[in-house]
Amino acid sequence: MGDGSITPRFGNMKALLGIVAGAGASYGLYKLISGGSFKRNKKSAATQSPGVRNRETIDVTLQPGSLLARVSGLDVVCPRPVDVASADIIHQSPGNIDPQHLKMLLSCLQTSNNPPDRCRILLTLGNCAAFTVNQNLIREFEGIHTIAGFLSDPVAEVRVQTLNALNNLCMNIQNQEHIKIYVPQVLELIEMSPVNSDLQLAALRLLTNLSVTDKHQHLLKESITLLLSLLVVTIEELQVQTLKVLVNLSSNPDMMDDIVQAPAPASVVLLFDARTAPAVLLRLLTFAGNLKDWRPSAQVADELRRKQDCLFRVMLDESSQLHSRLVQLLSHPDGEIQSQVARILT
């Protein structure tokens, strides 16, 4: 949708800015209409953790403590008032955005040829999707499939914002029925993206929400090895997110056969160490506890022992190093970790 069709509909630029400002994107849409582009700042190498690639981030100002600033880690564009008269409109709640404005955003998304503009629109839609009423409206407008179409966008930042928007939409159970068909594409993004990238993190967040209930967990049964491999090559933030998915899956007894026979890197067991970050170690112990609660028959156990490098042999077999490592963790300074270890060993 170009300038000529938007401006007459809403009268003037102030009105248009007011429409989407509550969704945290007035400045971004102003740039979209005016043909401008938003700036990106590259983080300096000095501020990056070792082994983490430099990432480009949208130059925005967050509203500290706001709801949207906490939802799925999405950045929120701070509205910039055009004048005093429009200030009240600009600070509307994203939950009060009108249906026709959501339609307009989806239409703009489909017609935009500019990657920064697509990012800004997806960011706005993602912020709107933090509210149930908008989650339902976007689904009814077939917006889920419109948004998901950008999972294959050639620009990485567009794919990240697409995943973030789908993640918020996924908090709605009805929306999950529409989003589940994109699981293979999301898994491919994880596998093909650079290690420790924003793309991997955003994709894992989406899979976490999708795997909270048992209904769609079977869609991930072929991805166990991929998830286990991520544990040994990624930074803490991605390890935590990966373990959230694994804990969800291992909480379902129907998934256990697929989990224990999946090929697993032997180095997974090395993470059960006092030097591992507590946030990672606690979830590892929860995952291990779920595995320990599984009781295979003698015949099944014998069959699994013949599967070289499967998770059963790495973590559950008598030959595994896990038991000795758990004993060492009984002296961990974190009391919660001690309790988790004691529960597994008893």
Where does each model-flagged region fall?
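N-terminal "cap/leader" segments of large eukaryotic alpha-helical scaffolds
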Residues: 2-130
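Conserved functional loop/turn residues at catalytic and ligand-binding sites
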Residues: 33-36, 142, 155, 263
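Alpha-helical solenoid repeats of the armadillo/HEAT superfamily
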Residues: 73-79, 113-126, 155-168, 178-181, ...
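Onset and early core of a folded interaction/catalytic domain in large eukaryotic regulators
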Residues: 94-186, 234
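Core helices of alpha-solenoid repeat scaffolds
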Residues: 98-103, 139-145, 176-187, 217-225, ...
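Alpha-solenoid HEAT/Armadillo-like helical repeat scaffolds in large eukaryotic proteins
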Residues: 104-111, 149-150, 185-193, 226-230, ...
